[in-house]
Swiss-Prot record:
Pfam families: HisG. Catalyzes the condensation of ATP and 5-phosphoribose 1-diphosphate to form N'-(5'-phosphoribosyl)-ATP (PR-ATP). Has a crucial role in the pathway because the rate of histidine biosynthesis seems to be controlled primarily by regulation of HisG enzymatic activity. This is ATP phosphoribosyltransferase. It is an enzyme of class 2 (transferase). Keywords: Amino-acid biosynthesis, ATP-binding, Cytoplasm, Glycosyltransferase, Histidine biosynthesis, Nucleotide-binding, Transferase. Lacks the C-terminal regulatory region which is replaced by HisZ. The gene is hisG. The lineage of its organism: Bacteria, Bacillati, Bacillota, Clostridia, Peptostreptococcales. Coiled coil: none annotated. One of its GO terms (cellular component) is cytoplasm.
Length: 209
């Protein structure tokens, strides 16, 4: 039987991804005791799990370094890779939103400056609305940008909204709801079809899809 290689995003989705695999009967003991290992074999289930940073999951899948991956829809929208997105896994739910200072009197304003970790998503959103904006790419806490005058608004993931409120910010507009997704390499789906299809069906049954 072919071994299926699956990439899991480090960070907020990792624990829930492992729980999903456990819920369909996969022995995830080696994942729980992996220490600093980045590649963990699950020989009983003919799986190999690779832990990578979330933005890298689409790249690993697209180039066939792994057969499939679990990653947030936010990453997929930003990366825009050629992948099969086969399942909404129904966890890691949050929203992409436009937010700014509670003291901002008018939204939107002409030629806004937009701070974000997701420049492609922000650009596409405002272009679709015919709004001219300047995108300012950031890596750190984007909430800081409106507070110090770097940007008028931010585009970011919002879960509870607590961080925004604590920093005097509010949501002006929601862009899209996001959640964890299962994505496949197109070639792998053909060459390992039976094994991958079986795994997809087990996950789909558990997630109700």
């Amino acid at each position: 039987m072919n071994v299926i290689k699956i990439a899991l995003a480090k960070g907020r989705l990792a624990d829930q991804s492992v729980k999903l695999l456990e819920s369909i009967g996969i022995d995830c003991g080696p994942l729980l005791d992996k220490g600093r290992k980045l590649i963990v074999a699950l020989p009983k289930d003919h799986l190999e799990v690779v832990f990578v940073k979330a933005p890298d999951v689409p790249t690993y899948v697209e180039h066939g370094a792994v057969d499939m991956g679990i990653v947030g829809k936010d990453v997929l929208l930003e990366a825009n890779k050629q992948l099969y997105e086969v399942l909404d896994l129904q966890f890691g739910k949050c929203k992409f939103s436009v937010a700014g200072s509670t003291s901002m009197e008018n939204y939107p304003t002409p030629h806004m400056r937009v701070a974000t970790k997701y420049p492609n998503i922000a650009k596409n959103f405002f272009q679709s609305k015919g709004q001219s904006v300047e995108i300012i790419k950031q890596e750190g806490s984007v909430e800081l940008a409106p507070m110090v005058g770097l940007a008028d608004v931010i585009v970011d993931i919002v879960e509870t909204g607590n961080t925004l409120r604590e920093n005097g910010l509010m949501v002006f507009e929601d862009i899209v709801e996001i959640s964890a997704r299962l994505v496949l390499n197109q070639v792998s789906y053909k060459t390992k079809h039976q094994e991958i299809r079986g795994l997809i069906d087990r996950i789909a049954e558990k997630t109700g899809k």
